[in-house]
Amino acid sequence: MNPETYLPIKTDRLILRKFQAADLASYADYHTRDDVYRFLYAAPPSDDAVKTQFAALLEAPFEEDGDTLRLAVTRSDDDTLIGEVLLKIASKAALQAEVGYVFNPDFSGKGYATEAVRAMISLGFETLGYHRIFARLDALNHGSIGVVERLGLRKEAHLIENDRFGGTWGDEFIYATLKREWASSP
C-alpha cells in the first residue's frame, strides 16, 4: 500500500508524516547524540553517515520483509521535528511487524513517544492489516519500557546477553500485542 494513501497521521498533539529534505538538520541533531545511541548498540554516526542514512530513508521501500517505514514525528502546533517512529516488516507471510522509535531527548517526559507509538501501532493493525506487532528494547532502557507498558504490550521474552557493543553484552526484552488485543484495549 502506498504511504501517500494514509499519511499524514494526526494525533492530539502530533503529526506523523514522511520525512522531507528540510528535516535533515533536526534529524542530525538527535542522531549524533550519545544519549540517543546508548540503547541502540551502535556509536552515533558521523555527519557524513547521517546524511547518507537520511537520504536512504527518504526513498526507502516498504513492501518486503526487512523493509522499514520511518515517519517523522512533529508537534502539530509548531512543526518541530521531535523524533521518529517506524514499522519494520518482520514477516509479510505471518503478518508481523516490529515497531520502533527514536526521539530527541530534549522532548522527553511529555508523552510524545507514547502518543506517536500508539498511532503507529494503530496504523499497523487498522490500515496495514498486521496480526502481531512487537518491540525489541534494551533491558536497561526504562523510558522505552514505560512506553510499551503504558500502551499495554505484553512482555514475551527476556533475551540474555544477545547483543554486544563496545565489548559489553546487553539484554533485550521483547514486548508484543496482537490485533485482537489492541482492538479491545482502552
Regions found by a protein language model. Name each.
Residues M1-R38, V73-P186:
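Acyl-donor (CoA/ACP) binding surface of acyl/acetyltransferases
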Residues P61-G66, L153:
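Short loop/turn motifs at secondary-structure junctions and domain boundaries
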